[in-house]
Amino acid sequence: MSHISLNICKDIFCGFFDSVRIDIAIKKLYNDQKLQKKIIKIAKFNTIMYLVPYIITYTVLNTFDYDLFSIINIVYLFVNVISGLFHLLYFIDLIDIVCVYTKKLNRPISKLDSIGLAIVSFVYQLSMYIIMELIDMMLYKKLDVVSYLIKFIILTLYHSFCCFNNLWHYKNIDIHHRISLHEKLWAYYLGYGTIASLMYIYSNHPLMIYTYNIYMSILIILPFMIKTKYPKKQAYPSINLKIFSIIVGYFNYAIKLINNSN
């Protein structure tokens, strides 16, 4: 049992360490002008979406004495409405960033691949938002600790799968093999998605949302830079993600229908 626990802790730490290898991304940014422009574009979008409205409302609140919460709600309602469109562009840019690397892939990369993966990423993001809201509605007021624990586990699975899904797609790894990797290396992916999940849980502040989006920009391109981890032997029990496999399968089926229609 102690040997299994040691292997689990080792993989969790390994995944966590890989998720903070920002130095690798910085080296790429320093040497790649195209990548720099895309990251700057993402930062500009986030600044317009979150930082500017926050600065305006904060300044207004500290300037006037009367209640301006209704104005704040209107401002952030507008931000949330256009956020959907922003994230679609945002994920397309992220996938384009991934495509510029010279990692050996099993098939050529097309623009249609980028658009399809961007749509899937957007659907993942929307699905996670709905799931988190449902968990809060059912558990938060009664079992807040349980609510946070469930959200954390789900979010780590989401973030790690979302980040590695692009690489697996371009390596032509089928969906069942992707799920199998996640089931066998769940401890590694738990560590990889830890920071992003904690940010997401506490992303009720514009500054945290801004930080989360910039961090995710790096987290999604890192799998194309770091050494990919594959299960060599079963060092600890795997988990069952068949439900996740079914959901992802439906998304991929929808993308195939879109590709065939074009």
UniProtKB/Swiss-Prot annotation:
Gene Ontology cellular component annotations, sorted alphabetically: membrane
Source species, domain of life: Viruses
Keywords: Membrane, Transmembrane, Transmembrane helix
Keyword match Cytoplasm: no
Lineage of the species this protein comes from: Viruses, Varidnaviria, Bamfordvirae, Nucleocytoviricota, Megaviricetes
Organism: Acanthamoeba polyphaga mimivirus (APMV)
Transmembrane parts of this sequence: 42-62, 71-91, 115-135, 145-165, 185-205, 206-226, 235-255
Compartments reported by the entry: Membrane
Protein topology in the membrane: Multi-pass membrane protein
Protein name: Uncharacterized protein L211
